[in-house]
């Protein structure tokens, strides 16, 4: 149940990502948008406003690959898993949470490029740390039920 809710939120953030990108592109004139940020959170590179569309398309592609691609989940683990029945729900949970955190980060970047929110590198680092923590936590749980 919880995984379905997280997957629904991931799809919602991806749809909002596309909506914000289309809204920004269709309602603004040809302006320079921030395309590169330095570590001090100030933009130092700018691009055309249409660059938000490939960024949003890349977000959709990443979401679709994470969510719907066929993957051999047990092959990518650093240890052998014999209890596949117990490990599979943990792997599904890990992938749904990772997809959620990645789509949330990409939505935040599109909002920052559309200049609706300021880009804070610290927030992206927190999301990245949460992503790594979720993966490590799930791999430890999978390791415990592997036999």
What are these regions (language model features)?
Residues 24-27, 60-78, 138-145:
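Membrane-water interface of transmembrane alpha-helices
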Residues 42-60, 91-96:
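Interfacial helix-start motif at the membrane-water boundary
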Residues 1-14:
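Alpha-helical transmembrane segments and their helix-start/interface "positive-inside/aromatic belt" motifs
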Residues 105-147:
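Alpha-helical transmembrane segments of multi-pass integral membrane proteins
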Residues 21-53:
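Active-site and channel-lining beta-strand-loop segments
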Residues 71-94:
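Cytoplasmic juxtamembrane regions at transmembrane-helix boundaries
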Residues 14-24, 57-62, 66, 96-110:
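Hydrophobic alpha-helical transmembrane segments of multi-pass integral membrane proteins
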Residues 10, 92-99, 124-128:
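Alpha-helical transmembrane segments of integral membrane proteins
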């Amino acid at each position: 149940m919880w995984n379905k809710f997280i997957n629904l939120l991931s799809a919602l953030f991806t749809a909002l990502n596309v909506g914000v990108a289309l809204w920004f592109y269709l309602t603004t004139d040809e302006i320079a948008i921030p395309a590169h940020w330095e570590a001090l959170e100030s933009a130092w590179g700018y691009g055309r406003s249409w660059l938000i569309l490939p960024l949003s398309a890349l977000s959709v592609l990443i979401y679709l690959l994470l969510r719907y691609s066929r993957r051999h989940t047990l092959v990518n683990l650093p240890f052998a898993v014999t209890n596949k029945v117990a490990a599979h729900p943990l792997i599904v949970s890990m992938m749904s949470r990772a997809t959620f955190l990645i789509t949330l980060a990409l939505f935040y970047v599109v909002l920052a490029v559309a200049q609706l929110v300021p880009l804070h590198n610290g927030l992206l680092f927190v999301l990245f740390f949460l992503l790594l923590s979720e993966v490590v936590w799930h791999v430890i749980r999978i390791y415990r039920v592997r036999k």
